[in-house]
Amino acid sequence: VNPIILGVLPKFVCLITKKC
């Protein structure tokens, strides 16, 4: 798995779910 994806995906989840 691309480590960049692992770094960016949580940020999108945070923004979408508003749970940071």
From Swiss-Prot:
Compartments where located: Secreted
Tissue: Expressed by the skin glands.
Keyword annotations: Amphibian defense peptide, Antibiotic, Antimicrobial, Cytolysis, Disulfide bond, Hemolysis, Secreted
Source domain of life: Eukaryota
Keyword Ligase among record annotations: no
Principal cellular location given in the protein's record: secreted
Pfam families the UniProt entry points to: Antimicrobial_1 (PF08018)
GO biological process, one term: defense response to bacterium
Cellular component GO terms held in the UniProt record: extracellular region
Annotated disulfide bonds: 14-20
Matches recorded under InterPro entries: Antimicrobial_frog_1 (IPR012520)
Task of the protein: Antibacterial activity against representative Gram-negative and Gram-positive bacteria and exhibits a very high hemolytic activity.
Sequence similarity: Belongs to the frog skin active peptide (FSAP) family. Brevinin subfamily.
Protein name: Brevinin-1T
Species the sequence originates in: Rana temporaria
Organism phylogeny: Eukaryota, Metazoa, Chordata, Craniata, Vertebrata
